[in-house]
């Protein structure tokens, strides 16, 4: 299956007609790129200019401590967006590294074009903005649930869970 077919089947584009899909690709200046396993996509401190939609494979965000040890934050699998939260103008740089944990195909969208409707306020662009906002809401709810679960765990359980995630990450 070619990369455009993968993108068309994504939750963000499957409601668009083929004509609208091609138009939105041009409107948003979307690119599709393949990344190899362990290839770094964005470094911490890079200007936050793009959002990344996983079409296949898996991406991970991580912090790296002073010893170079990776501390995993979140995995992104099929139909998950990384970078939508950087639409906030107060956050102009990526705060973590993004890399592929396996061979991956990723759709890259310019953040400014993604959230700024085109001059003629086309309905297809409004549909994409709506999907992005829904994705932000899903992410927010998922984070709230995770924080709530962590708040209910004992410190011992948190440490064991963290260590098991770190060991499986290595």
PLM-predicted stretches and their roles:
Residues 40-46, 63-64, 85-87, 97, ...:
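Short histidine-centered beta-strand/loop micro-motifs
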Residues 123-170:
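Polybasic "coupling" helices that flank or enter modular domains
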